Amino acid sequence: MKNKPDDRRDNVDKIQYNITKTIQNCEFADEIIAKTDDEKTKKTLIEKNERRREALDGMREEIKDEARDKKNGYM
């Protein structure tokens, strides 16, 4: 089996897509939190949003690295 070559040309786009979707998920969860009276659901969604925000920090760092590498020709 041949390994695929490392093609990173669209990594920035993929990461940006994931950032956008994660932000949308956070906003949707915030809407549910505001509307629901179910404390268990609120707690679960708040915890999930905390993890999402941590993931966003990591993705933002990763996109900076990828953008820099893309600019430098992926050396």
From Swiss-Prot:
It comes from the Bacteria. InterPro entries: SASP_thioredoxin-like. This is Protein Tlp homolog. Belongs to the Tlp family. It holds the Pfam family Tlp. The gene is tlp. HAMAP family: Tlp (MF_01506). Residues 52-75 are annotated as: Disordered. NCBIfam families: SASP_tlp.
